[in-house]
């Protein structure tokens, strides 16, 4: 494994996102002097918080899996997860709604889930589910330590016995045919493959190794932190500060300074130079290269994941039939992926994620009120020539609200008291390449050692963390990326 050369005592981490915070904790545990520089007044990055008229909204991820990956950087400095976060297991993890009117509750207890699938789809599907759980559990255990949890510099790093085991399991086949080995009912096929969208691919294009996302979501368990997802970066930052990490909030980094082929620190917007032995960059990787680092002669062309429109809704209207997380599938399943990913079009028959945080935590809204987070996948700004300015955002939001009312949210529009719309243009303004919060797609050529490295190719003391580098997209992967970035600094080649 390649590591940072030269002194590593003073480290600047640019950005207090989940990856940057995890990295800072691991570095503090290794005795480094760490300063985190963050442009916002609070930590969190994409896992931010929006307060509007008594309503509180998570502005980034809403699904939390694998809390042991939060516990890991805390444990590195001797802290317990339970002292910093109160987590509620969600049961069901999701409630799925299908065009035929049927529903399926996703339970993380395999016995109860098998019974639910048997009730809705029949005994054969339940048997397939149990075999699928066994497959994905083995997949996760093989991938976590030997592929996801390691710094991979070249394809040679993949060559070990576990690669042969993965090949034997069919992990490098396409996801959709692999799902078809276990499930025949389109409803179960959808609930265990829709996660491919967040890896940037349609299920028939994604590799079967990404079935681990379904494992994390629907088998390992989904949790909700008291205070919302923003409570996670608050906890990590609090623990880091307790253990000597310095935080500089409301401070924008303009560029990384270099001399003699090495980074020497960063310059802030007010002209201050902060010296460092190592610089860790948590902003979206392509944007960090574009805005903070010396220009490269031939920047790599990346393929980006789809984006999304998110509606943050504060409402008078409750719906007793829904769960915390709700997935509403449209009729046109394969066609939806084709529209969003290949053709750069908005979904003609939307599939939507509706999260109702006040279902679990009433403190997110005024008394008797509800918060809703509505996510609709859309093309990113490179794939779809959609002008989100000039009223397009409101027109599309209105269309999504009409779709929700047709799908059972009766009177939804009348109950809205607060509405905030986030579009791909807003994601781009927030510093996300191609206007997507899901970073580079997980194509074969952008996975593992082929994904952009977390070590700069010519500045040996610049390291990256976050979803744009290894191992990839999603809260669990970003937390692991922080550990991998720290290992580049603290370990010996």
Question: Where are each of the predicted segments found?
Answer:
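N-terminal glycine-rich phosphate/pyrophosphate-binding loop and immediately adjacent elements
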Residues: 5-141
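A conserved FAD-binding loop/helix module that cradles the flavin
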Residues: 61, 467-490
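Rossmann-like flavin
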Residues: 99-207
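A glycine-rich dinucleotide-binding beta-alpha-beta segment and adjacent secondary-structure elements
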Residues: 185-199, 344-355, 410-471
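Helical element adjacent to the flavin cofactor pocket in flavoenzyme catalytic cores
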Residues: 212-267
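Mid-domain catalytic core of redox enzymes
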Residues: 254-366
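Active-site-proximal substrate-binding core of FAD-dependent oxidoreductases
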Residues: 258, 491-493
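C-terminal segments that line or cap access tunnels to active or ligand-binding sites in enzymes
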Residues: 316-428
């Amino acid at each position: 494994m390649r590591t940072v050369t030269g002194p590593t005592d003073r480290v600047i981490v640019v950005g207090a996102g989940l990856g940057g915070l995890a990295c800072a904790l691991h570095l503090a545990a290794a005795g480094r002097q760490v300063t985190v520089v963050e442009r916002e007044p609070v930590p969190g990055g994409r896992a931010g918080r929006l307060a509007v008229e008594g309503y509180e909204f998570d502005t980034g991820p809403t699904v939390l899996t694998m809390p042991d990956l939060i516990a890991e950087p805390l444990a590195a400095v001797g802290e317990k997860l339970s002292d910093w976060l109160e987590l509620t297991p969600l049961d069901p993890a999701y409630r799925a709604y299908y065009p035929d009117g049927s529903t399926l509750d996703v339970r993380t207890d395999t016995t109860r889930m098998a019974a639910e699938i048997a009730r809705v789809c029949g005994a054969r599907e339940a048997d397939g589910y149990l075999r699928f759980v066994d497959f994905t559990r083995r997949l996760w255990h093989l991938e976590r330590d030997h592929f996801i949890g390691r710094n991979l510099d070249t394809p040679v790093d993949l060559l070990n016995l576990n690669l042969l085991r993965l090949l034997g399991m069919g992990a490098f086949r396409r996801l959709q045919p692999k799902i078809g080995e276990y499930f025949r009912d389109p409803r179960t096929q959808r609930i265990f493959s829709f996660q491919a969208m967040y890896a940037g691919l349609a299920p028939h294009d994604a590799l079967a190794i990404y079935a681990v996302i379904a494992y994390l979501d629907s088998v390992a368990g989904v949790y909700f932190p008291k205070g919302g997802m923003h409570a996670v970066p608050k906890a990590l930052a609090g623990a880091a500060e307790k253990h000597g990490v310095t935080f500089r909030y409301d401070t924008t980094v303009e560029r990384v300074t270099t001399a003699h082929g090495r980074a020497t620190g960063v310059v802030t917007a007010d002209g201050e130079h902060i010296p460092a032995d190592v610089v860790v960059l948590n902003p979206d990787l392509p944007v960090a290269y574009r805005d903070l680092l010396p220009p490269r002669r031939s920047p790599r062309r990346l393929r980006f994941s789809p984006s999304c429109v998110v509606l943050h809704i504060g409402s008078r209207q409750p719906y007793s039939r829904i769960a915390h997380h709700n997935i509403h599938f449209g009729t046109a399943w394969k066609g939806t992926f084709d529209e969003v990913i290949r053709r750069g079009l908005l979904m003609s028959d939307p599939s939507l994620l509706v999260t109702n945080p006040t279902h679990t935590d009433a403190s997110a809204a005024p008394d008797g009120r509800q918060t809703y987070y509505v996510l609709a996948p859309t093309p990113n700004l490179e794939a779809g020539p959609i002008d989100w300015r000039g009223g397009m955002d409101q027109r599309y939001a209105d269309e999504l609200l009409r779709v929700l009312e047709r799908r059972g949210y009766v009177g939804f529009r009348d109950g809205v008291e607060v509405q905030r719309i986030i579009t791909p243009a807003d994601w781009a303004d927030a510093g996300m390449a191609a206007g997507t919060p899901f970073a580079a797609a997980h194509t074969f050529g952008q996975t593992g050692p082929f994904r952009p490295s977390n070590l700069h190719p010519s500045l040996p003391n610049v390291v990256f963390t976050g979803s744009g580098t290894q191992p990839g997209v999603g809260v669990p992967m970003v937390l692991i990326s922080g550990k991998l970035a720290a290992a580049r600094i603290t370990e010996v080649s």
